[in-house]
């Protein structure tokens, strides 16, 4: 049974709040540090190798990129954060834009925070999860590149991150491992996002 996410198509790139689509649909946002594997996650979820641009240059995503799944239902690729080579004034601009987006975007149904399983829960990751918590939105902490660790190390890291998230957010954040290479966790994430967007599977 195929996922409706596989129908995703590029819609637009927004540099300011005024360029966003009308705020009357449903959307799921993807946030993550530069090089956490966010573009690969989007491409894997949609089974499209070039939907989100995978770059060797961290911080390449410099706008909110919208992908239409069905009319009025979107996946949103947020700018990669935490990369030192992005000019300070641009960092300030994006921080203000992201603040506005999280506090005022009524269409937002959930947030996926993408983290490299080898370097989880940096300050920016916690900040993104805090945004979701403040809005009362569901959030999924996604530990990517799980294939880089053995099963034992994965389980150990998963438990460590779960304990840390519980300390900060009680039990309000879901957590899972994910690998674009082995497709580990893909179905689990499909289910989460389809539920948030109110999408039904086709036979």
UniProtKB/Swiss-Prot annotation:
Q: State one Pfam family annotation.
A: MMR_HSR1
The organism sits in which domain of life?
Bacteria
Which annotated residues bind Mg(2+)? 39, 61
Q: Which cofactor does it need?
A: Mg(2+)
> Which UniProt keywords are listed?
Cell cycle, Cell division, GTP-binding, Magnesium, Metal-binding, Nucleotide-binding, Septation
Domain (EngB-type G): residue spans on this chain: 24-199
- Protein's UniProt name: Probable GTP-binding protein EngB
| Species name | Xylella fastidiosa (strain Temecula1 / ATCC 700964)
Q: What is the lineage of its organism?
A: Bacteria, Pseudomonadati, Pseudomonadota, Gammaproteobacteria, Lysobacterales
């Amino acid at each position: 049974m195929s996922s409706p996410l596989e129908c995703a198509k590029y819609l637009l790139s927004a540099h300011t709040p005024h360029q966003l689509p009308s705020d009357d649909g449903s959307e799921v946002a993807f946030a993550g540090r530069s090089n956490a594997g966010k573009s690969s996650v989007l491409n894997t979820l949609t089974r499209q190798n070039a939907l989100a641009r995978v770059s060797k240059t961290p911080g390449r995503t410099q706008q909110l990129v919208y992908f239409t799944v069905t009319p009025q239902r979107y996946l949103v690729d947020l700018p990669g954060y935490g990369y030192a080579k992005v000019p300070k004034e641009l960092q300030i601009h994006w921080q203000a834009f992201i603040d506005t987006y999280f506090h005022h975007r009524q269409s937002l149904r959930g947030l996926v925070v993408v983290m490299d399983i080898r370097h989880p829960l940096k300050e920016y990751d916690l900040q993104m999860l805090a945004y979701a918590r403040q809005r009362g939105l569901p959030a999924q902490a996604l530990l990517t590149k799980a294939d880089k660790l053995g099963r034992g190390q994965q389980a150990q890291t998963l438990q460590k991150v779960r304990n840390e998230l519980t300390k900060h957010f009680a039990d309000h954040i879901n957590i899972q491992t994910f690998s674009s290479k082995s497709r580990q966790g893909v179905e689990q994430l499909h289910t989460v996002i389809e539920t948030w967007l109110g999408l039904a599977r086709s036979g």
